[in-house]
Amino acid sequence: MAGRGFEEVRATFTTCLPKQHRDFLEALTVSAVIGDYFFCHAGVRPGVTLDRQRRDDLLNIREPFLSSEAEHGKLVVHGHTPAVAPELRPNRIGIDTAAFATGRLTCLVLEKDQQHFLPESYWTGQ
């Protein structure tokens, strides 16, 4: 697809994707609340309640979310912004360790009010 514009690629993909698959993807939610945790792809807009977050922010935000120390009502678990290691902050947990480029996938374990990460050796046996 070299030399093709994004819109052309998107149109081709949309045409080739079966309607059943497209309907499934369009029906997915962009966030979830489980207990004291709020899960989303990118993060939230500080100062906006979780139930009023915009789809675009949930999928694309970086700043001011990443530098914010504000409480969000729940502990936000997110990806979208790669880091060398998982980030555990009082108001958020960043789990994007660039698996697409590094091969290191982060596994966050949430047990009651405790959070920890499984070490790579858990998966590799090393």
Q: What does each of the following model-derived ranges do?
A:
Residues M1-G94, A98-R104, L110-G125:
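Acidic, His/Gly-enriched loop-helix segments that form or flank divalent-metal centers
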